[in-house]
């Protein structure tokens, strides 16, 4: 009897699974807010240079006399006349309203606070020559996510999913709250970096802890539900940012609830599958009996003895006592193939995804509306993804989502700028496909890696995703060469990466592999049941050989 059979015997999707899955995925609502928070906390309002202190700002003429005009007749954002220019304005706004010398804003800036009363941009003047610092803050957050994925993925395979998850909740709460009270920009960046580390750990361990407690036939449901909860977080972020436009209060609003998540996470039950893979049979038995009691299967739990558990999980116990390191992903041929292919998928999905979602102000419409639309498109996209994942397979779902996303982005690159509705529609469709790709790849990665290195594999995949999210803003700088170059790159990468899916196994309806040998058998087309039958056939042959000897 394999581990999946034990779960079914002890209630399948019982009261325990429903309660723990709900509590584990609840923090993901606010996790979506952390990832794209700077769309609002670092929004750039309309601004222009502040004139000298003795200027009468209540008089439009006095203010206009200090402000040069750009080619479209708008005030320059980063230049100020060295002396007021009182001459009449030029017609059609084609030239500046004076011929005097200009200088970068020596007295600071005046911001339009009608939409964004307070952001890190307005508080620390991250505009003009300091504009790159705004992107630096987001890049540092993503670097934190990258380091967190590398660190907490490996730690969870060694220390357990529950312990690492509890620590991640606390770190997110503390670092996020400290960021809300940051006295200066360097301190803000440091706390955001720490927040990024912990949010990566939350995502990885939430998904793994849930998957390892669920029977085979329900894993796709859990993966899709997790994706929907993340999408709900995008809706919630738009509403919270609209209701709480001050960046410090918004930062605190999405961080403080993690103190509550930290408190109730102490009641989570550690993965019995991880205990078994670690060779800790006593704790495996204890947790399975606790789950049986919660699910109302007291008799089945009482009948589950140490001997029965050893017989059921013989292979897990004999092969899982040695902990695997991240180097196994490269050393072992079977794992190396999975690692390389999945790395391309993780990188491509995140690279294109953040290329779209971190440039909401570039659409030319309300940033709150775009945030809601980007969240809304996930609902039908993930429903279609779920149906394909659960009925057709993981591979078709992953390939279709990446290909369609890349094609939509590539088409967007050739659509004229004045076709804003068409461009926005294609971007929204592409974003929905990329959200579906994320939904699938989290589930898919957890199913192809063996238990002994599953969390490490997820962590390395998330690491590659973070590399994509860090590189993505740099690619946007190629727009200076030609406006559509970033879109061509964002579209080409997922299309090219989709070819790697052909080298991955289908996992629909398959048991989770526990060892590297399971991965090898799957690659060779052998199921666990076939292996057990082969071993049974070998027993009489071995006995016959012993008699002859």
From Swiss-Prot:
TM helices/strands, residue ranges:
24-44, 136-156, 165-185, 196-216, 225-245, 249-269, 338-358, 369-389, 396-416, 426-446, 457-477, 485-505
Region: Disordered; residue ranges are 521-549
Reaction(s) catalysed by this chain's protein: (6R)-L-erythro-5,6,7,8-tetrahydrobiopterin(out) + a dicarboxylate(in) = (6R)-L-erythro-5,6,7,8-tetrahydrobiopterin(in) + a dicarboxylate(out); L-erythro-7,8-dihydrobiopterin(out) + a dicarboxylate(in) = L-erythro-7,8-dihydrobiopterin(in) + a dicarboxylate(out); L-sepiapterin(out) + a dicarboxylate(in) = L-sepiapterin(in) + a dicarboxylate(out); prostaglandin F2alpha(out) + a dicarboxylate(in) = prostaglandin F2alpha(in) + a dicarboxylate(out)
Q: Which UniProt keywords apply?
A: Cell membrane, Glycoprotein, Membrane, Transmembrane, Transmembrane helix
Q: Which domain of life is it from?
A: Eukaryota
Q: Where in the cell is it found?
A: Basolateral cell membrane; Basal cell membrane
**Record Pfam families:** Sugar_tr (PF00083)
Which is one GO molecular function term here? Answer: antiporter activity
- Major localization listed first in the record, in broad terms: membrane
Q: How is it modified after translation?
A: Glycosylated. Glycosylation is necessary for proper targeting of the transporter to the plasma membrane.
What SUPFAM superfamilies has UniProt attached to this entry?
A: MFS general substrate transporter
Domain observations:
Multiple cysteine residues are necessary for proper targeting to the plasma membrane.
Q: What is this protein called?
A: Solute carrier family 22 member 6
Q: Which gene encodes it?
A: SLC22A6
């Amino acid at each position: 009897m394999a581990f999946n059979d034990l779960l079914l015997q002890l209630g399948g999707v019982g009261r325990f699974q429903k309660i723990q899955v709900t509590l584990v995925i609840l923090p993901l609502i606010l996790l979506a807010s952390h990832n794209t928070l700077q769309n609002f906390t670092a929004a750039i309002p309309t601004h222009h240079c502040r004139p000298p202190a003795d200027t009468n700002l209540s008089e439009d003429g006095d203010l206009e006399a200090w402000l040069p005009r750009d080619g479209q007749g708008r005030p320059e954002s980063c230049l100020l006349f060295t002396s007021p220019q009182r001459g009449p304005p030029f017609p059609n706004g084609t030239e500046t309203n004076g011929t005097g010398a200009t200088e970068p804003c020596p007295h600071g800036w005046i911001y339009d606070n009608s939409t964004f009363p307070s952001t890190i941009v307005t508080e620390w003047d991250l505009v003009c020559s300091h504009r790159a610092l705004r992107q630096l803050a987001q890049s540092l957050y993503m670097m934190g996510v990258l380091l967190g994925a590398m660190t907490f993925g490996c730690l969870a395979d060694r220390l357990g999913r529950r312990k690492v998850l509890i620590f991640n909740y606390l770190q997110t709460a503390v670092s996020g709250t400290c960021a809300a009270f940051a006295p200066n920009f360097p301190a803000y960046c440091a706390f955001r970096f720490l927040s990024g580390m912990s949010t990566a750990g939350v995502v990885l361990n939430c998904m793994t802890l849930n998957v390892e407690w669920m029977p085979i036939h329900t894993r796709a449901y859990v993966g899709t539900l997790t994706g929907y909860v993340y999408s709900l977080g995008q809706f919630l972020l738009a509403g919270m940012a609209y209701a709480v436009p001050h960046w410090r209060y918004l930062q605190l609003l999405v961080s403080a609830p993690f103190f509550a998540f930290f408190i109730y996470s102490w009641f989570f039950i550690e993965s019995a599958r991880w205990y078994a893979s670690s060779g800790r049979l006593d704790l495996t038995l204890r947790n399975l009996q606790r789950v049986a009691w919660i699910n109302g299967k007291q008799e089945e739990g009482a009948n589950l003895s140490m001997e029965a558990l050893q017989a059921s999980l013989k292979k897990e116990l004999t092969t899982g006592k040695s902990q695997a390191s991240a180097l196994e992903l490269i050393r072992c041929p079977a794992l190396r193939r999975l690692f390389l292919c999945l790395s391309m998928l993780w990188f491509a999905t995140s690279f294109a995804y953040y290329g779209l979602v971190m440039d909401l102000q570039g659409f030319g419409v309300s940033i709150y509306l775009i945030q809601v639309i980007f969240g809304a498109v996930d609902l039908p996209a993930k429903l279609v993804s779920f149906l394909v994942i659960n009925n057709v397979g993981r591979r078709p779902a992953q390939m279709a989502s990446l290909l369609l996303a890349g094609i939509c982005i590539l088409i967007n690159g050739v659509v004229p700028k004045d076709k804003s509705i068409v461009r926005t529609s294609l971007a929204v469709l592409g974003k929905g496909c990329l959200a579906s790709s994320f939904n699938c790849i989290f589930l898919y990665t957890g199913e192809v890696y063996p238990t002994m290195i599953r969390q490490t594999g997820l962590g390395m995949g998330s690491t590659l995703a973070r590399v994509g999210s860090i590189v993505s803003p740099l690619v946007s700088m190629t727009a200076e060469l030609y406006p559509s170059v970033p879109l061509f790159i964002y579209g080409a990468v997922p299309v090219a990466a989709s070819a790697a899916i052909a080298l991955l196994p289908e996992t629909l309806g398959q048991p989770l592999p526990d060892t590297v040998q399971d991965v090898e058998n799957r690659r060779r087309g052998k199921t666990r049941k076939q292996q057990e039958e082969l071993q049974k056939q070998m027993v009489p042959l071995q006995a016959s050989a012993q008699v002859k000897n």
